[in-house]
Amino acid sequence: MRTIISLLLLSAMVFAVIEAISLEEGLQLFEGERGCVGENQQCADWAGPHCCSGLRCKELSIWDSRCLG
């Protein structure tokens, strides 16, 4: 019985890791498709500000907004 429970837990952990990797790859692909921009680049605001992962759009002035960490 302990062996079965251990195998089930191990399977669940492996599945969770595989799902996390797949999700991360999917997010990276989505960022490329929507035209994310890197640090200190002007925010891509055609459909709302889109900065790459870990960055956020910071409004420096009325006319200038940049992606910053």
From Swiss-Prot:
Proregion residues are 21-34
What kind of modification does the protein receive after translation?
Does not contain a cysteine at position 61 which disrupts the cysteine framework.
- Signal peptide span per the entry? 1-20
Please verify whether the record's keywords include Disulfide bond. yes
Q: In which tissues is it expressed?
A: Expressed by the venom gland.
Record-level Gene Ontology MF annotations:
toxin activity
State its location(s).
Secreted
Give disulfide pairs as residue numbers: 36-52, 43-57
Source organism superkingdom = Eukaryota
List the GO cellular component terms: extracellular region
Q: Reply yes or no: does the keyword Metal-binding apply.
A: no
Q: Which UniProt keywords apply?
A: Amidation, Disulfide bond, Secreted, Signal, Toxin
Q: Which family does it belong to?
A: Belongs to the neurotoxin 01 (U2-agtx) family.
Q: What is this protein called?
A: U5-agatoxin-Ao1a
What species does this protein belong to? Agelena orientalis (Funnel-web spider)
